[in-house]
UniProtKB/Swiss-Prot annotation:
GO molecular function: monoatomic cation transmembrane transporter activity
Subcellular location: Cell membrane
Protein name: Putative transport protein VSAL_I2029
PANTHER family: K(+)_H(+) ANTIPORTER SUBUNIT KHTT, TRANSPORT PROTEIN YBJL-RELATED
Residues that span the membrane, as ranges: 14-34, 37-57, 66-86, 94-114, 161-181, 386-406, 409-429, 451-471, 478-498, 539-559
GO annotations of cellular component type: plasma membrane
HAMAP family: YbjL (MF_01015)
Domain RCK C-terminal: 203-292, 293-376
Keywords: Cell membrane, Membrane, Repeat, Transmembrane, Transmembrane helix, Transport
Matches recorded under PROSITE patterns: RCK_C (PS51202)
SUPFAM superfamilies xrefs: TrkA C-terminal domain-like
Residue runs in coiled coils: none
Signal peptide range in chain numbering: none
Species name: Aliivibrio salmonicida (strain LFI1238) (Vibrio salmonicida (strain LFI1238))
Length: 560
């Protein structure tokens, strides 16, 4: 049996799609020193190569890819989107606007100076900012008819221009951002690692590289005369053992009877007490607890230690500092803080926002009690609420179909903005109603990434057919324009953050990378700073930047 692979691929879009995905993801895993292409650029390069060989892809497949991607972006942004205007949020919003407005202005100027074809400037800007949402917004404005092409301009040519501009510029945008993130602080004789350590010391944040997360352990001790002398007749509230050591007295056996003590309890000689705390907290106990008086009693030690992920929901908690929760007062222990999928340093001064996830451990009933005060315990389920997912997806498309007329001008949202709005709404409702619209984070990540990569396949295949011709005509112009659009907005944002907003450099660099929605650069900067402190800034700008980048793509193609 003879199989003509070339013919098979040209006749079967689904097979072609997954062949390009597989080859691209394989290339993405190749490392050159510490540099790795990443899945998006790996798939894009493969698709460009296959496109240059004459393979094509249906437009409908491309559309479903970008629709899924942008809808999932909205769901992820939903819980934190409205909190961006709280506290430091205005600073983060300003940085995003500086990057975006300067990038749009420079894109128009370079497009005019280099006489770039219609759509090429927009694609170049999307790549230079490593912002796929810009490309999504622009392509959707064309597909939906929101953007009316000038007379004599070919639709397919413009779509190819968008793809080629993005493909040429992406690598320039990524590498220049990583280099600037390292270089700009050094020009001021500042070190990212020192800046991160400064924030850590000022705010009492442990080093992410050194901090290890343990479950609390239970140990029991018999109260002797030495311990009675140490307590000096004070009750548990006055002793404040949990404030001094981090341990919490969960249970007491007195005269054979087990009891859960309150703050008024006074220890007596012969009591047996069970304490819950981290291993190092037990080590900080006064020696009068430990000197030969440890007790091994199954009933006394039979406490159910639970670890749960609590989602911040309640209005009286959102906007408070982490330290105001006083988790230790409830006998609970904080292990992790996650915001917008970014693990944050455990900073007691951090302001909580709806949708934040706190990983808390402690005795099961106490963890559930504190969860009711904060919000709700995240559902540990592998089942997605596909009804809500599909319903809001439909609503997003319907929002995009709504148009308004002003005289002879007709304006509408388009699918991209419509799906963003519906996605944000679903994400916001999910953060406030634990049983509604639940999608496991792993499923959401896979859907978003698959949608993005399918979109990349479509871009590469459509642009690849003329890639050599494009490069010979406009390649150097696009690369020069991309370098300008990538570098100058970052420098402007850095100057605003450093001299007007007076931001710590580690936070500032993280915020700029978030404003550029560039995850790969964030990983490199965290490694360079030897800290996750920059992630605080990244989480502050990332959600709002994703939304505004999509709108910017629509604006660019409308005004081009």
């Amino acid at each position: 049996m003879n199989i003509d692979v070339a013919t098979l691929l040209s006749q079967n879009d689904i097979l072609l799609l997954f062949v390009v995905l597989a080859l691209g993801l394989f290339i993405a895993k190749v490392k050159i020193g510490s540099f790795q292409l990443g899945s998006s650029i790996g798939v894009l390069i493969t698709a460009l190569f296959m496109g240059s060989l004459g393979y094509t892809f249906t437009a409908d497949s491309l559309n479903i890819g970008f629709m899924l991607f942008i809808f999932c972006v909205g769901i992820e942004a939903g819980p934190n989107f409205f909190g961006i205007f709280l506290r430091d949020g205005k600073h983060y919003l300003l940085l995003v606007l500086v990057v975006l407005i300067s990038a749009i202005s420079l894109s128009f100027l370079t497009g005019y100076y280099f006489n770039l074809d219609y759509g090429l400037s927009t694609g170049m800007m999307a790549g230079a900012l490593t912002a796929t949402p810009v490309l999504v917004g622009a392509k959707d404005a064309l597909n939906s008819g929101l953007a009316v092409l000038p007379e004599g301009v070919d639709f397919s040519k413009v779509m190819d221009n968008l793809s080629v501009g993005y493909a040429f510029s992406y690598l320039i945008g990524l590498t220049s951002l990583i280099l600037l993130a390292r270089l700009l602080p050094q020009l001021q004789k500042q070190n990212l690692q020192d800046s991160a350590m400064q924030i850590a010391q000022e705010r009492g944040i442990g080093s992410a590289g050194q901090r290890k997360v343990y479950l609390p352990i239970i140990r029991a001790y018999r109260v002797g005369q030495e311990l009675i002398d140490w307590t000096d007749g004070k009750n548990l509230r006055e002793l404040g053992i949990h404030r001094q050591t981090g341990c919490h007295i969960e249970r007491i056996r007195r005269n054979g009877i087990l009891a859960n003590p309150d703050g008024d309890y006074i220890l007596q000689q012969g009591d047996e007490i069970a304490l819950v705390g981290y291993p190092d907290s037990h080590a900080r106990l006064d020696s009068s607890f430990r000197n030969g008086k440890e007790v091994f009693d199954r009933n006394l030690l039979d406490l159910r230690i639970a670890e749960e992920e609590i989602v911040v929901k309640n209005d009286n908690i959102a906007g408070k500092r982490l330290s105001e929760l006083n988790l230790s007062e409830y006998g609970c222990f904080l292990n992790r803080v996650v915001r917008a999928q970014i693990e944050m340093p455990i900073e007691h001064d951090i302001v909580l926002a709806k949708g934040d996830i706190l990983q808390v451990s402690g005795e099961k009933s106490k963890v559930h009690h504190i969860a009711d005060k904060i919000g709700f315990i995240s559902i540990h389920s592998q089942v997605s609420d596909l009804l809500a997912f599909c319903s809001f997806f439909i609503l997003g498309i319907m929002f995009g179909m709504i148009t308004m007329s002003f005289g002879q001008v007709t304006f509408g949202l388009g699918n991209a903005v419509g799906l963003l709005i519906s996605g944000i709404t679903l994400g916001f409702l999910r953060a406030n109603h634990p049983t509604f619209g639940y999608v496991p984070q792993g499923a959401l990540n896979m859907t978003k990434n698959l949608g993005l990569l399918v979109f990349m396949v479509g871009i590469g295949l459509s642009a690849g057919g003329n890639i050599i011709e494009y490069f010979s005509e406009d390649g150097l112009k696009v690369l020069a324009a991309a370098l300008i659009v990538s570098v100058i907005p970052v420098i402007l944002a850095y100057l605003v953050g450093a001299y007007i907003l007076k931001m710590n450099r580690a936070l500032l660099i993280g915020a700029i990378i978030g404003a550029r929605t560039c995850g790969p650069a964030m990983d490199v900067v965290n490694e360079h700073a030897r800290s996750t402190i920059p992630a605080l800034g990244y989480a502050g700008t990332y959600a709002i930047a994703n939304i505004l980048m999509t709108v910017a793509g629509t604006i660019m193609i409308l005004l081009a």
